[in-house]
A protein has these predicted regions:
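C-terminal lobe/tail of nucleotide-utilizing enzymes
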Residues: 1-14, 211-226, 236-396
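Nucleotide-state-sensitive switch-loop elements of NTP-binding domains
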Residues: 1-21, 25-28, 33-240
Length: 396
């Protein structure tokens, strides 16, 4: 049976975290929940909290009431909290990743010389990869996460990841970067022409690539990856450091879901994958759950004799409100519709509870908090709604 979570438990989890990575499938309210967790920490804890979104949909700005958001960190005005009816003890900041600008910074940092950095930045393939290749966003997300974590500028960083399995792409990005530098493809593209043996072995590859891509484009590819390989040491060392941060004791993970079929299935998958990667799972948050009191009251009402509420009840209510008196037939149709709707509410609540129980069981070994947020009609687009969402979290 669901009980109100001791707020100190939730705040203790936030207080003990330096990095909170929020995962979930699309459409479950993950971005808003990330903001709500950040706002909750900033409200009750004396902390500088940063909410960092790597979600390409870029919805966090609207939810936090900011005019613009990007690589630059923007502070959420304390007045926004005051208008939501709370006085924050800490501070809340928000930022989102500009993939191209972040890659440019990374190239300048890892290139052995400024001249090589400029050659990489000027390469046409570099521009195409950083602007269009989805996994370039994954890797740079981890770089940005690591930067803000290591800077020590914030006491807590809440990271809003892309939807569901894309979140795992982000978390696996450091390993993919390390594997890339060890890949056969990179060796083929960057092997010196003077190496006769290797050149003969790779000749079929280049003949096919030349026909498909054209000599000029192939030359551009070879130049880019040859230059990129000069930065191998810096990238590999950084990838190792990022992986270590993700497994630190003060790095926690939270999975957000709704209790519909597909999101609940994805949440089950995420829980399994996160635990198999030995990440610290701190919370499962079921969002937009039917209020238990509503389901209980509706269930109790359905146990009453249907005949106790007849057309006369509605006709009397209409007369008291000064409305035209409905016919007995109209009243029967309305009552039948209400009765079916009430049955649907109870049935939906039973299904939700079953799915929540299953997810709770999946969390039992990790000791993660299982939290719920009740269904709210309409979209949350301001700090008042964000603060209310964070404050409404309850446990089971």
């Amino acid at each position: 049976m669901k009980q109100q979570l001791d707020s100190s438990q939730l705040l203790a989890m936030l207080d003990s975290s330096k990095l909170l990575v929020v995962c979930g499938s699309g459409g479950v309210g993950k971005t808003t929940m990330s903001a709500a967790l950040g706002a909750l920490a900033a409200t009750h804890l004396h902390k500088k909290v940063l909410v960092l979104t790597v979600d390409p949909a870029r919805r966090l700005a609207d939810a936090l009431g900011l005019q613009a958001i990007g690589n630059a960190v923007v502070q959420v005005d304390a007045m926004a909290f005051n208008e939501a009816g709370v006085a924050p003890q800490g501070q809340l900041f928000a930022a989102m990743i500009d993939t191209k600008a972040s890659w440019d910074d990374l190239i300048h940092r890892h290139a052995p010389t400024p001249a090589i950095a400029q050659r990489v930045l000027a390469n046409a393939l570099y521009t195409n990869l950083t602007e269009r290749f989805v996994h370039s966003h994954d890797y740079i997300a981890m770089e940005r996460l690591y930067d803000v974590y290591q800077s020590g500028a914030y006491d807590l960083v809440v990271v809003d990841t892309p939807p569901s399995r894309n979140a795992l792409d982000v978390l696996d990005a450091p390993k993919r970067m390390r594997d890339f530098f060890n890949s056969r493809l990179l060796q083929l593209l960057t092997t010196p022409a003077q190496s006769r043996v290797v050149s003969l072995m790779s000749k079929p590859f280049f003949q096919v690539a030349d026909r498909i891509l054209g000599a000029r484009f192939l030359s551009s590819i070879t130049e880019f990856f040859t230059l990129f390989r000069t930065m191998e040491k810096g990238f590999v060392e950084r990838a190792n450091k990022v992986e270590n941060v993700l497994r630190n004791t003060d790095t926690k993970f939270a999975v957000v879901t709704t209790l519909e079929v597909a999101p609940a299935f994805e949440a089950e998958y995420l829980l399994t994958e996160l635990q198999s990667r030995s990440f610290s799972l701190a919370a499962l948050i079921a969002n937009r759950v039917l209020p238990l009191t509503l389901a209980n009251q509706t269930s109790a009402a359905l146990t009453n004799d249907r005949s106790l509420v007849g057309p006369e009840t509605l006709q009397t209510a209409a007369a008291a409100a000064g409305l035209p008196t409905p016919s007995a037939e109209q009243c029967e149709r309305v009552l039948a519709t209400l009765w079916r709707a009430a049955q649907d509410v109870v049935a939906a609540s039973v299904v939700e509870q079953s799915r929540l129980d299953k997810l709770s069981h999946s969390c039992s070994k990790s000791g993660a908090n299982v939290l719920t947020a009740q269904y709210v009609s309409g979209e949350i687009t301001d700090m008042k709604g964000i603060v209310a969402l964070g404050e409404s979290l309850s446990g089971i």
